[in-house]
């Protein structure tokens, strides 16, 4: 970013007015109610804007907190830590239950029942249905992915949340329902709570909606929609907005680097970093690299006849800690 770009940290936080604690329309402190695209192009359309917007508000405050820490801005760090905790508390009060599950009202689709409505100032009516565990319309994969990956679930509830999160995948037969907001957080959140096996199952799914469905049907680029083309019926998604080269769902690539290859920074700029490769599902080989400020970091592994072989590149003037899948640390 150049020095005149108003999106840089310094300008955004000079007077505190650029990063609001809540929408002007909010009736509950720290809950975000502004209209937005939400989990765009999701398959189940069940994650309310207010839920995802509040989760992302907390995440934004957390990013600012960490940025302030790196820059040595202690007053800002304190301010954004407090803001994060306040939004987290409001998020939990609104949507996280005592048993670690989440529940909320979501927009009604053609598949859900009408159980409530709200009327806007212009007279338009939005119908809602209640989404909770053990009901026909359970909370979405995105709902759990955001809550877990943004550290919004209290630690004493996380074990139970893990169970409900896993169920959000299994009840859809190991297929995806996430849209643009949930896609980059789904696999990392699953790994965060020890559900790597579920993440690999999603990765290898070939039925629609999945990453490999498009590959199986000849795709060489990432589609905008999970159903940009349905081979079984020979039909296309909404042609008014249906790109066959739209990388949003390719956000799973981050998890390839951080978890399958296992490259994670410990110190800023990868002065020190972790190498903690993972294997799972039917995957027997992985290799990748990127150029850090100190030089090329690479990680490669393969499985053959039950033997795990690993190779890596560590740049000069950096330190890496290697954690192998069997738990050995070097």
What are these regions (language model features)?
Residues 1, 58, 65, 78-92, ...:
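Hydrophobic core segments within long, regular secondary-structure runs in both alpha-
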Residues 1, 56-74, 143-156, 185-194, ...:
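Well-ordered alpha-helical scaffold segments within catalytic/enzyme domains
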Residues 1-52, 70-110, 114-144, 156, ...:
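Active-site acid/base region of carbohydrate-active enzymes
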Residues 48-59, 138-142, 178-181, 247, ...:
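Aromatic- and histidine-enriched alpha-helix N-cap/loop-to-helix transition segments
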Residues 97-98, 109, 135-234, 238-241:
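Extracellular polysaccharide-recognition and catalytic grooves
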Residues 197-330:
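Non-catalytic C-terminal accessory modules of carbohydrate-active enzymes
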């Amino acid at each position: 970013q150049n020095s005149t770009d108003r999106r840089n940290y310094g300008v955004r936080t000079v007077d505190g007015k650029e990063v609001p604690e809540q929408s002007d329309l909010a009736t509950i402190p720290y809950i975000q109610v502004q209209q937005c695209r939400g989990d765009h192009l999701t398959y189940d359309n069940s994650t309310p804007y207010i839920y995802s917007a509040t989760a992302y508000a907390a995440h934004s405050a957390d990013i600012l907190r960490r940025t302030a820490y790196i820059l040595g801005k202690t007053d800002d760090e304190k301010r954004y830590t407090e803001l994060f905790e306040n939004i987290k508390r409001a998020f939990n009060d609104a949507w996280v239950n005592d048993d670690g599950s989440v529940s909320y009202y979501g927009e009604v689709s053609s598949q859900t029942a009408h159980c409530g409505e709200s009327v806007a100032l212009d007279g338009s009516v939005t119908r809602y249905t209640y989404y909770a565990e053990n009901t026909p319309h359970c909370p979405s994969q995105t709902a759990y992915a955001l809550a877990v990956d943004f550290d919004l679930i209290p630690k004493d509830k996380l074990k139970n949340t893990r169970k409900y999160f896993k169920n959000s995948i299994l009840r859809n037969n190991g297929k995806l329902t996430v849209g643009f907001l949930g896609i980059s957080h789904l696999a990392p959140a699953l790994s965060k709570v020890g559900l790597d096996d579920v993440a690999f199952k999603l990765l290898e799914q070939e039925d629609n909606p999945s990453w490999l469905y498009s590959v199986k049907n000849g795709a060489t680029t990432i589609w905008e929609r999970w159903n940009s083309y349905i081979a079984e019926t020979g039909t296309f998604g909404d042609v008014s907005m249906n790109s066959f080269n739209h990388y949003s769902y390719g956000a799973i690539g981050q998890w390839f680097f951080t978890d399958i290859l296992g490259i994670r920074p410990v110190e800023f700029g990868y002065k020190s970093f972790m190498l903690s490769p993972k294997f799972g599902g039917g995957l027997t080989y992985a290799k990748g690299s990127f150029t850090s400020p100190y030089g090329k970091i690479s990680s490669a592994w393969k499985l053959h006849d039950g033997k795990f072989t690993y190779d890596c590149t560590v740049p000069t003037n950096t330190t890496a800690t290697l954690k192998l899948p069997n738990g050995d640390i070097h």
